[in-house]
Amino acid sequence: MNWISNVVPPKIRSFLRRDTPENLWIKCPESGELVFHKDLEANLFVIPGSGYHMYIAPKPRLDALFDEGVYETIPTPEVPLDPLKFRDVKRYTDRIKEYRQKTGAPDAVKLAYGKLQGLDAVVAVQDFAFLGGSLGMAAGEAVITGMQQALERQAPFIIFTASGGARMQEGMFSLMQMPRTTLMVQALREARLPYIVVLTHPTTGGVSASYAMLGDIQVAEPGAVIGFAGARVIEQTIHEHLPEGFQRAEYLQAHGMVDMVVRRHDLPAVLARLCAFLTNSPRRAPIPA
């Protein structure tokens, strides 16, 4: 070993080193297919070969949903950040700050208002990347605000659900959001305004036990896991094996819990068609087969 071997290789490695973005290639959890990240983004985060629907953030979802990607963001109310002064391995306030920095959002629900094939609609999107899309005071207030906006604008309300359930760090304050949101669903019904739920992967826990399963029309993305408790918990409780595909969107459709399973690319046309039908508006594009 001499100075040449000590100095030259590091120099060469330094020269050849380049800043390479992580996750250039995304692997399909179902088929193992590798997809270039830009191609996956252009395909709305649906794996081309297998059709597997991966996580999609609220912004690209809304961009693809509304006419020409044009919509108005509806601000969500501020709520007390940490009413219980909760702490586990870290303080709850620190967790919130971490996820706000990670997602660029104040909490797990984003609201927007725009046109679906010319029809007004208020849309809420739950972001599973923000603390598992969990339902706390902020998320509950956001959902309620979206429904209130639909009432004020006399427009259909559409919500894309994705959640692991109630936010444990907020205790009873989190559980209170279940009846509060359910009451607002009833207000939409009394006003004869369409309430359409799009169940995305996963929709579980307290969200599935409240507003997520109360839609006039229940739509689901392919392969989405939908249920209250997890499959393993159910099996351990009843001491029986569950049917294949249990809690998947297609299974729920076959058993009457979901009205239709719709591919992500087809959702704008399908939702516009449903809104037109439920509001007696002029018919637009047909629902894709």
Curated annotation (Swiss-Prot):
One of its GO terms (molecular function) is acetyl-CoA carboxylase activity. Pfam families: Carboxyl_trans. It is found in: Cytoplasm. Pathway: Lipid metabolism; malonyl-CoA biosynthesis; malonyl-CoA from acetyl-CoA: step 1/1. Its main location: cytoplasm. GO terms for cellular component: acetate CoA-transferase complex. PROSITE patterns: COA_CT_NTER. Keywords: ATP-binding, Cytoplasm, Fatty acid biosynthesis, Fatty acid metabolism, Lipid biosynthesis, Lipid metabolism, Nucleotide-binding, Transferase. Its EC number is 2.1.3.15. The keyword Cytoplasm applies. Residues 24-289 form the CoA carboxyltransferase N-terminal domain. One of its GO terms (biological process) is fatty acid biosynthetic process. The keyword Lipid biosynthesis applies. It catalyses: N(6)-carboxybiotinyl-L-lysyl-[protein] + acetyl-CoA = N(6)-biotinyl-L-lysyl-[protein] + malonyl-CoA. PANTHER family: ACETYL-COENZYME A CARBOXYLASE CARBOXYL TRANSFERASE SUBUNIT BETA, CHLOROPLASTIC. HAMAP family: AcetylCoA_CT_beta (MF_01395). Belongs to the AccD/PCCB family. This is Acetyl-coenzyme A carboxylase carboxyl transferase subunit beta. It comes from Beijerinckia indica subsp. indica (strain ATCC 9039 / DSM 1715 / NCIMB 8712).
